[in-house]
């Protein structure tokens, strides 16, 4: 898979994905896209055929009670994918990395 990691997540996740064999993985900051709004990232994600990894799921999939209704992907018929790493607010980047490194 070709992952693009959102700037709200650690670049360590991108490094981990590369080490696990996903060599086309990148991070928003590495691509000099940090600070862009979600709607500005959307065409880059779609044109690059990226599977986007974020913890801001509502921004992309819409509210949990009505997924797909108001998120950035609501008007997209098909895309490479969206991975939402949601969790308890106390779930730190270290916890995310630890969980993701288990395969």
From Swiss-Prot:
Entries under InterPro entries matching the protein: DUF5615
Protein name as catalogued: Uncharacterized protein y4eN
Top-level taxon in the UniProt lineage: Bacteria
Keyword annotations of the record: Plasmid
Species of the source: Sinorhizobium fredii (strain NBRC 101917 / NGR234)
Organism placement in taxonomy: Bacteria, Pseudomonadati, Pseudomonadota, Alphaproteobacteria, Hyphomicrobiales
């Amino acid at each position: 898979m070709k992952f693009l990691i959102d700037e709200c997540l650690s670049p360590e996740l991108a490094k981990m994905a590369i080490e696990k064999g996903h060599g086309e993985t990148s991070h928003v900051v590495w691509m000099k896209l940090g600070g862009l709004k979600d709607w500005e990232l959307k065409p880059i994600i779609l044109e690059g055929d990226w599977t986007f990894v974020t913890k801001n799921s509502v921004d992309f999939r819409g509210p949990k009670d009505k997924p797909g209704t108001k998120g950035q992907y609501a008007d997209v018929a098909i895309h490479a994918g969206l991975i939402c790493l949601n969790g308890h607010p106390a779930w730190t980047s270290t916890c995310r990395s630890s969980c993701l490194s288990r395969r």
